[in-house]
Design a protein with these regions (language model features):
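A short helix->loop->beta-strand "cap" motif at the edges of active sites that frequently abuts
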Residues: 81-85, 102
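A short, glycine/acidic-enriched catalytic loop
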Residues: 59-82
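Solvent-exposed loop/turn segments at secondary-structure junctions
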Residues: 10-11, 37, 58-61, 92-96, ...
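Short glycine/serine/threonine-biased micro-segments
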Residues: 54-56, 66, 106
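Mature extracellular/periplasmic domains of secretome proteins
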Residues: 47, 77-79, 97-100
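Active-site-proximal C-terminal subdomain of hydrolase catalytic domains
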Residues: 93-178
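Extracytoplasmic/secreted cell-surface and envelope-processing proteins
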Residues: 13-15, 61-69, 95-99, 114-116
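A domain-level signal for caspase-like cysteine endopeptidase catalytic cores
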Residues: 1-55, 87-89
């Protein structure tokens, strides 16, 4: 199964590279990263691949390129991936996935930087945010080629911490119980 990773990069999501770095040299993997990825290249890659992994910043309306704040993926692009297994790792991706009935593992609000933690009044420091980010991405990297339901189970079982408020918050936003 051919897999496409789309990651509109910016410094605040560099930690996400853990998810796909080890797969960069595989023949059945395509990785699109950077800023301002042309939509023609994205659409062509969406058609040519069987599984799609979206990574970065976003809203319930889709995946953003934080540089320039333009949407890279929206409901207008569903025709290219609606019937494919997808992973949507961006803030409130679960709303997007549920609204469009996708076969997806999708994150809810996902605190990955200090400003987001402050917005949600989470008492934390950068070390705990980094620990949360790394834990989540390492687990997702190990199961990213699985069925979305199995990814959800693996994340729910592995992405835990009794002492990290960021992990606890992110788990709650994904609908996991402790």
């Amino acid at each position: 199964m051919k897999t496409l990773f789309i990651h509109p990069t910016d410094p605040s999501t560099d930690f996400c590279k853990i998810i796909y770095e080890d797969y960069r040299d595989q023949d059945d993997v395509t990785i699109l990263t950077g800023t301002r990825i042309p939509s023609t290249i994205i659409k062509k890659a969406l058609v040519e691949n069987d599984r799609i992994v979206f990574i970065g910043h976003g809203t319930e309306y889709g995946l953003l390129d934080k540089i320039g704040f333009r949407y890279v993926i929206t409901a207008a692009d569903l025709q290219f991936f609606r019937n494919k297994p997808v992973v949507c790792m961006w803030c409130n991706a679960n709303i997007f996935a549920e609204k469009h009935n996708l076969n997806a593992f999708a994150t809810g609000m996902f605190v990955s930087e200090k400003s987001e933690a402050e917005w949600y009044r989470l008492s934390t420091d950068q070390k705990l945010i980094d620990e949360s980010n790394e834990l989540f991405c390492r687990i997702l990297s190990r199961c990213v080629f699985d069925d979305p339901k199995d990814i959800r189970t693996t994340i729910e079982r592995g992405y835990k911490s009794s002492t990290n408020p960021i992990v606890k918050f992110n788990r709650e936003c994904m609908g996991f119980e402790d």
